[in-house]
């Protein structure tokens, strides 16, 4: 049997993520500490306590990468190794680290810049993204078109993640 590590993109983060791993596994603590050194701030404080910053792309992306690699290192320490890796969007960077195509510090630095550039591209309050789950694609497309026609902004399906899951962009 083959084992695949699949890494998610942004959106699954929550305050408190990784705290148990950090407290109970030295290998996870090491990953968080290494990320802190690259970032120049405490990613563990953001992951464990700061829901507001976790909602900001600039901080969420390094937090998710760090958490993903910490969890992977714990699994590896417990004898679970990946035969293959895959990632969605931001998760691709975790997959690169897991497959040893990129080292962790390089990925943290790159993802920090990625998050910063994405935040600068759409300043706070000027837009949002929503994961729409369980609705028919045509209905989502129609709703976006109606919202655009009736409003002062733009609403469009931005990413068709999977059947029944569409990421929509709203720009005001």
Question: Language model features by range: what are they?
Answer:
Residues 2, 34, 67-70, 93, ...:
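Residues within well-formed alpha-helices
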Residues 87, 91:
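Gly/Ala-rich beta-loop-alpha elbow adjacent to hydrolase catalytic centers
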Residues 2-86, 168:
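Helix-rich "cap/lid" substructures immediately adjacent to catalytic or cofactor-binding pockets
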Residues 10-12, 39, 99-170:
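Alpha/beta catalytic cores of group-transfer enzymes, especially the acyltransferase/condensing modules
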Residues 92-93, 129:
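A broad, low-specificity signal for short, low-complexity segments enriched in glycine/proline
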């Amino acid at each position: 049997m083959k084992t695949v590590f699949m890494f998610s993109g942004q959106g699954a983060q929550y305050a408190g993520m990784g705290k148990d791993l950090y407290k109970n596994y030295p290998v996870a603590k090491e990953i968080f500490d290494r990320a802190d050194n690259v970032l120049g701030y405490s990613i563990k404080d953001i992951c464990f306590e700061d829901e507001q910053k976790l909602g900001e792309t600039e901080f969420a992306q390094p937090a998710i990468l760090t958490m993903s690699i910490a969890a992977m290192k714990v699994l590896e320490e417990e004898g679970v190794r990946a035969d293959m890796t895959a990632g969605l969007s931001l998760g691709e960077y975790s997959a690169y680290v897991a497959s040893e195509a990129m080292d962790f510090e390089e990925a943290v630095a790159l993802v920090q810049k990625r998050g910063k550039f994405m935040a600068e591209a759409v300043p706070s309050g000027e837009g949002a993204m929503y994961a729409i789950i369980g609705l028919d694609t045509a209905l989502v497309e129609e709703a976006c078109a109606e919202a655009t026609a009736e409003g002062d902004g733009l609403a469009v399906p931005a990413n068709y993640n999977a059947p029944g899951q569409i990421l929509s962009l709203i720009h005001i």
